[in-house]
Amino acid sequence: MSRRAFSVAVFARNGGAVLLVHHRRLGTWLPVGGELEADETPLEAARRELLEETGLSGRFPAGLGVDGTPAGLIGYEEHLAGSKGLHMNFAFVADVPSRELAHCDEWSEARWVTGPEGLDCPENVRQLLVLALAAPSSSG
């Protein structure tokens, strides 16, 4: 398989709740995120996507993994995605200072949730949501 697509998902966290948005094109609840740009690291893409889709800057907690692991990284997943080939997604958690969101055309509704119960979203989003809620907070 020669084609690959790289993306990030950012679970923005504030006051014990995590932000999910209802994605217009995909029609389901997801964290904010998107594809990496040409010369971006996954963490740089996560910071950019969070700001673009919410207007918020986040603090990505350090020390969640092995030395060399990007701050805030809580998971990695891959799957085949049609013409894109292998889709590789890096999932992050970021502590944000507010629940006030800038409007974004990519989503139609936003919710701050405290758990996966009752959510109409993919199973991997439920699993990562639990990890995001349990991850240590950033230290400033």
Residue ranges and their predicted role:
Residues 24-26, 68, 108-111:
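Short, solvent-exposed aromatic-acidic interface loops
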Residues 1-18, 35-38:
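Conserved N-terminal beta-strand and adjoining loop/helix that marks the start
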Residues 55-99:
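Active-site segment of metal-dependent pyrophosphate-handling enzymes
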Residues 17-52, 56-59:
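Conserved Nudix-box catalytic region and its N-terminal flanking loop in Nudix hydrolases
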Residues 137-140:
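Actinobacteria-biased recognition of intrinsically disordered, low-complexity terminal regions
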Residues 90-93, 100-134:
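NUDIX/MutT-family hydrolases
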Residues 5, 13, 31, 83-89:
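Short connector loops at helix/strand junctions that flank enzyme active sites
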